A protein has these predicted regions:
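Hydrophobic transmembrane alpha-helices of multi-pass small-molecule transport proteins
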Residues: 54, 105, 119-138, 244, ...
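Transmembrane alpha-helices of multi-pass small-molecule transport proteins
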Residues: 36-82, 109-110, 159-166, 180-198, ...
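Juxtamembrane helix-entry segments on the extracytoplasmic side of multipass membrane proteins
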Residues: 8-12, 36-44, 65-70, 137-159, ...
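Alpha-helical transmembrane segments of compact multi-pass small-molecule transporters, enriched
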Residues: 48-53, 102-113, 186-190, 238, ...
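Hydrophobic/aromatic residues within transmembrane alpha-helices
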Residues: 33, 42, 46, 90, ...
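Transmembrane alpha-helical segments that form core, pore/gating elements
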Residues: 54, 110-111, 127, 133-134, ...
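Hydrophobic alpha-helical transmembrane segments of multi-pass membrane transport proteins
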Residues: 18-25, 29, 57, 74-89, ...
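Glycine-/small-residue-enriched transmembrane alpha-helix faces in small-molecule transporters
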Residues: 1-44, 78, 82-86, 129, ...
Length: 295
């Protein structure tokens, strides 16, 4: 049986749970590197390694690329790069679960804008209340860099919204994972002038190299490839609904791997954000074939 046929049989929720465990497990591994390599440098290295893996796997030079295709893939890559760098800066200052929940304002906003009805509109209000609770607890904690973390996660949320919209446009043009490889390469090239120097410490220790490769595979290659597959099945609003499965995953990974235990008020904020995402109504999924799933 072809791998694409197997993936096509896996329900979207199951794909997202596996994707979330990998992505946030990779984030927890990345946090352990921040003492040696700045967070932005780790994020760029993650993108660089993921780009190399995807380019070797998908060999995008075999496709015919129009100027529009390249511009779209580059814009997608820039959004992806900003999202990753800002998120890593945020989790250097905020608990993983809190950062992930606040970042979900991006997908909730996409659902509200692209969907229709009271569910999508009310989701924004609930998400806003949840974010206020989470941000309030963070600011009252007097944790070093809390304000920096909140600003960074706001930037990440905005970039995530752009990623969803641009990712949909990339995916529907066909061979989404191959186009993702080009987007990753564009993100690595754009970030290189600013982040190469910050990433230099990794060159002196093979254990750091191995850790960065692990972060890239867990947090970029697997999750983003899965998301490209699922984006072929659902619209932006539906994608945002499926993402409602992930905040709890981030909290569990943060608690188990990083010993970041949320307070009661934070749990309420997390719950409100999850409900906000769940309230948004997905569009009717488009048919998916085995070839689409294996793209």
């Amino acid at each position: 049986m072809r791998p694409g046929s197997v993936v096509a049989r896996v329900p979207a929720p199951a794909l997202f749970v596996g994707s979330g465990l990998a992505q946030y497990g990779g984030a927890a591994l990345a946090v352990g590197l921040f003492a040696t390599i700045p967070a932005a440098g780790v994020a760029w290295l993650r993108i660089l390694v993921a780009a190399a893996v995807l380019l070797a796997w998908r060999r995008p030079w075999r496709l015919a690329w129009s100027r529009h295709d390249l511009v779209l893939a580059t814009a997608f890559g820039v959004a992806l790069g900003v999202m990753n760098v800002a998120f890593y800066i945020a989790i250097d200052h905020l608990p993983l679960g809190t950062a992930v929940a606040i970042e979900f304002v991006g997908p909730v906003t996409v659902a509200a804008v692209t969907g229709s009805g009271w569910r999508e509109r009310s989701g924004i209000g609930l998400a806003a209340i949840g974010v206020v609770l989470l941000a309030g607890v963070t600011l009252r904690s007097d944790a070093p860099g809390a304000t920096v973390g909140l600003v960074a996660i706001g930037v990440a949320a905005t970039a995530w919204a752009a990623y969803i919209m641009l990712g949909r446009a990339v995916a529907v043009r066909g061979d989404g994972v191959t186009r993702l490889a080009v987007a990753m390469a564009a993100a690595a090239l754009v970030g290189a002038p600013f982040l190469v120097a910050r990433s230099a410490p990794v060159l002196g220790d093979w254990r750091l190299v191995a850790a960065v490769v692990g972060v890239a595979l867990l947090s970029s290659v697997l999750p983003y490839a899965v998301e490209q597959v699922v984006l072929r099945r659902v619209g932006p609003a539906g994608f945002a609904v499926l993402l409602a499965l992930l905040p709890a995953t981030a909290v569990v990974v943060g608690a188990v791997a990083l010993r970041q235990w949320p307070h009661a008020v934070e749990l309420v904020g997390l719950a409100l954000v999850s409900v906000a995402i769940g309230l948004t109504r997905s569009q009717r999924p488009e048919p998916v074939t085995a070839a689409d799933a294996g793209a």
